[in-house]
Amino acid sequence: MRRIKIATLCAAALLLAPFTVQAQKLPPDIAASKIVRAALNTGYAPLETRDPKTSEVVGFDIDLAAAMAKVLGVKIEYQDGSFEQMTPSLQSGRVDLIMSGFYDIPRRRPFFDFIDYLRAGGQFYTLKSNADIKVATDLCGQTVTTGRGTSYPDSIKKWSDKNCVEAGKPPIIVITQTDFAQSLSVIQQGRAAAGVSGLEAMPSTIERDNNGYRALGEPISFTLMGMAFTKDDPTLRDAFAYALKQVIADGRYATLIKKWRLDFCSYTEVSINQGPAP
């Protein structure tokens, strides 16, 4: 009986071995260099920001990428730039992936493949001192700021068309900024009544400037956040999908979700290209 059990276990190991090796296979250049270059847009806590004391990049995305890199035996090297620069950086081959608050949405999928790893969506926020803005429809006819190159301008327009225009109210005026800090500055200066950012950023947004902000209404969109890879790089995509599964299975993903207060964004299905249009 013992020999039968051993034989069964050996057969199972042989069946699993090709999958494991294949799952961790890396493109030849990365296998040789042990370096994966990732596009990054800092200033979007809690996903990626710079520690004010050390200037080091920290955040959920940084920790999760490091955990996956450890599984694959590689090192992540970041190229920090504006949000709208990330897409051309990946398309031109200057980086190997994007993992920086990047939504998996249909209009991006003709160019990229996504590994989904967080629930996400858009949320209005404003200053606590904006007493005349009590509900989201108070933004009809007012200016709202958000990130350039994101899906939020489209989400705001859809929401405005349904909740403002159809109700006979003037539409929301959308302006865009190159990064989150600029959006906050525009609101503080009174050039915009509110902003739209991700659900994942709301806890840290509300705490900024001595808890000077508040979320406004319900989320205006829902989708999934993903790591983006070029369509011609399925080997690297599959390697990171394997690594993410391992990090979820061993509990490190849950630990990082708790550390960065992203419980409402947890997503453990490791799906490919499944984000709905926000």
What does each model-identified segment do?
Residues 36-37, 74-75, 92-100, 142-143, ...:
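Alpha-to-beta junction loops
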Residues 66-72, 152-176, 206-210:
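Ligand-binding cleft/hinge of the Venus flytrap
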Residues 62-71, 130, 137-151, 226-265:
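Extended ligand-binding regions for polar small-molecule ligands
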